[in-house]
Amino acid sequence: SKFKHPIYGDELETFKMYQNREPRFYVNVFWSGMTWHGANKKTANVQFYFNGNSGPGKSHNYPPTGYLAHKFTNPSIDTSTGNYGYLDFPVFRYAEILLNYVEALNEYDPSNADITLYLNMIRKRAGVPDIEEVYPDAAGDQTRMRELIRRERQVELCFENLRYFDTRTWMTAETDNNMPVYGMNISAKDHKANGEFWQRVICKYDGGR
């Protein structure tokens, strides 16, 4: 169905699974059929299927999952004029400080009101409802709140090279990082609606080694 990207305003045909997602999804994730802004200012509809302009049949530089990380990209870049732009990569974000604090506080004092206070500061900035509005049973429930804090950390800090260390801190790597990597079927001949490209496939699995 027709969809207007909430960040760039581009109109494209896409599936419902890409519509009405939270704002951080659109900032962080790039999927086949979207328009890439930047580079040489020749905005292009990017195609990740086999013979698409960014697929394995046309390029050696393609995403095996059919997705790209879109975080920290600069749409003002124009390589045709030598403008490669600048982006500050965070070393320690304030959001991470808050997430560290609420995670520790939940382990020490699960009923402390600061947990929802500071967690909601992150969520408000991201444009999503307060945690207790979405999960009214979470406040004071240490196990449930631990799960939600870890999920919030996964979303807020995605593509910032922290997930690897987080799963080891939590001692969950053996299960969290021991599963197949799924993605779109990039060997498909096109990415038409209901075509083979959109079939979820295993992209990589090493058996947990």
Task: Give the residues covered by each predicted segment.
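Intrinsically disordered, low-complexity segments enriched in glycine/proline and serine/threonine
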Residues: N74, L99, N106, Q199-I202, ...
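Extended, hydrophobic/aromatic-rich amphipathic alpha-helical segments that build helical scaffolds
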Residues: M17, R21, F25-F30, F89-I122, ...
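Boundary/linker segments of alpha-helical solenoid repeat arrays
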Residues: P129-E133
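Long, intrinsically disordered, low-complexity segments
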Residues: Y84, D88-V91, R123, V134-R209
